[in-house]
Structure formats: structure tokens, C-alpha cells
């Protein structure tokens, strides 16, 4: 989210993203929850149960494949994060500027053994958590980890906002500049930029909530009938968006404080 926000001009893109989150992300999440709760089946079998005579259930297998692809993405990035935790703990980034940090990242990407090793570590941790079940494993551990995440992010926000030169990053992130959504010398280039921004905002709304790949059907199958699906979706969207906005308050002030291009990712 912060990377795409920096690429498309900061606060103006944030408003565009929030719009699609409300008009697309939230309704689609409620619908996916409804499919899961009504069928009480996995994402691969939910449509067969609800509409056995229709051919729309073929989509469920594509969604299942999408979940596998998404898992490949998250296990890879999760491996990067574990590697960075070790590097930070051993002082690998001490005294490095932006170019030096980029070299460390490039060296990690050039080392297949390191990448595969950390990815496998993430997979093992994930399997261990899932083996404990949804409520005793995923739910219980997620509550602890999310609390720790929010506490760490609050500390980082305070630190980032107190850096010299952080004011420029705050303005970039929180003050909309709609002209950046139409960047370009000609009218066609300007509308192309706006179209790309709209597409990115729409895609981010789906990506950040893991929509369209049947993942939410799985969680929906565990939601009791005494719970409001809309209420659950609103809380999830609110928490997800809050974390994304906090990440922006960490990254953009730090980027401007250290002279790093906020659109570099």
C-alpha cells in the first residue's frame, strides 16, 4: 500500500483507494462470507453445495489455485522478513545509507539458498499454526501477533514522525494533490496516468482483503449465524485499512527524512 501510494502521489491515491474499498471491497467481502457460511464447506466445494446444477462452481477451483499462488507470494515475502529480522539483530544494516541497504537486499535476492531456506521456515511455521486448528491455532496466535504488530507500529510511527524533515513526508501523505493523478504532458498521457491510478486503487482494494480467490469463503464457513457478516467485514476492513495507514505514517516521513524516493517501493 505505501509503495503504490508513493507511486501515485500520496493522499490523492489514498482517497481513491478508500472509495473502492467502500464500494467494492466491503460488499464483495460480505458476499464471500455469505457463500462460506451458507455452504459450511471449503472454497472448492462451496459452489457445488449451493448451486449443484450450475456451471459457476467451476470458478471455485480457479479461486483455489489463486490461494496457492497467493501463498507462494506470502511465504516468499515472509521469508524476506525473517531474514531481515536476523540481519537487523546481527547489525547488518548498521551505518548503511539507502544505497547500502539496497545492496544487502540485492545480495539476498542473488542467494537462492537463503531465499529457499527462509521460505521453508515460513512454511513450517504456517503448517504448525494451522495444525492446531482455526480457533486454537490461527485465531489465538493471530490475536497475540496483531496486538504486538500494532504496538510496534505505534512506536515506529512516533519515531518516524519525530525525525528531522519528517514534515514533508506527512504533507505528501496526508494532503491530497489531485494533479499527480493526472501527471503527463498531453491529455492522453494524463488520462492514462489516471486510469493506471484507478486500476491500482481497485486492485489494491481486492489484494489487501484477499478477495476474489475464495479465501474469505473459508473464514465465512466458521462465522456463526449469530454474527453479522456486514459487521465482521466492516471490522476487518477497518483494521486492515488502519494498519495500512499506520504503515504510511512510518514510511513516508522516514523516506523524506533520509532522502529516499517514496515511489521506489
Regions found by a protein language model. Name each.
Residues 17-26, 63-89, 118-132, 147-160, ...:
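Hydrophobic core segments of alpha-helical transmembrane domains in multi-pass membrane transport
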Residues 1-14, 19-23:
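N-terminal signal-anchor module of multipass membrane proteins
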Residues 16-51, 75, 214, 258:
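Juxtamembrane transmembrane-helix boundary signature
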Residues 3-8, 38, 43-62, 75-135, ...:
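Inter-helical loop and helix-membrane interface segments of multi-pass membrane transporters/permeases
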Residues 11-17, 49, 57-61, 227-236:
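Membrane-interface alpha-helices at helix entry/exit sites of multi-pass transporters
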Residues 1, 143-265:
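Membrane-embedded translocation segments of transport machinery
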Residues 118-137, 209-225:
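Transmembrane alpha-helical segments in integral membrane proteins
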